[in-house]
Amino acid sequence: MTEYFEVGKILSPHGLKGEVKVNATTDFPEERLANGSRLFIKNSDQYQELIVDGARRHKQFYLVKFEEIDGIDQAEKVCGKELYVAETDQQELPEGSYYFKDILNCPVYDAETGEKLGVLANIETPGANDIWEIKPEHGKSFWIPNIESVVNKVDLANKRIEVTLLEGLRDEN
């Protein structure tokens, strides 16, 4: 069974010819929204394919034309729907890069002591660097920045993340 991953959301129609305004939530908007790209929306429990017929940046959004949508009435019907990419359409990432789905729930260890700190429970992308929520088995969750001085190693093969905690990142109380 094919898995699908969210890459954006259709916000509103734009004009009368079926263009829609899209908030892209992917690190690869130019690739995902390239002419001929396959994206999907979910209707009930089925995924419907949409083929990108054109896209351009507009402020912090993208204006996208899909082959299957040729008027404002059809565009209004897809507003509010998330856009997905099929797992089979995902590109191979460069060395040292990974999809969130591959590292979520990985155990996180202190690189110096080997102590298990918890699991990677959540990832937020607020700005220049992602921040990761580490959820210990007992106690309060804490957040770390995904920067070289903190995240030392991400071993996808062994599902293991090693970090060096800077002073103040973890509330010991």
Swiss-Prot record:
Keywords: Chaperone, Cytoplasm, Ribosome biogenesis, rRNA processing
Listed GO MF terms: ribosome binding
GO biological process, alphabetically ordered: ribosomal small subunit biogenesis; rRNA processing
Domain of life: Bacteria
Subunit (UniProt): Binds ribosomal protein uS19.
Family: Belongs to the RimM family.
Function: An accessory protein needed during the final step in the assembly of 30S ribosomal subunit, possibly for assembly of the head region. Essential for efficient processing of 16S rRNA. May be needed both before and after RbfA during the maturation of 16S rRNA. It has affinity for free ribosomal 30S subunits but not for 70S ribosomes.
Recorded domain comment: The PRC barrel domain binds ribosomal protein uS19.
Protein name per UniProt: Ribosome maturation factor RimM
Organism: Lactobacillus gasseri (strain ATCC 33323 / DSM 20243 / BCRC 14619 / CIP 102991 / JCM 1131 / KCTC 3163 / NCIMB 11718 / NCTC 13722 / AM63)
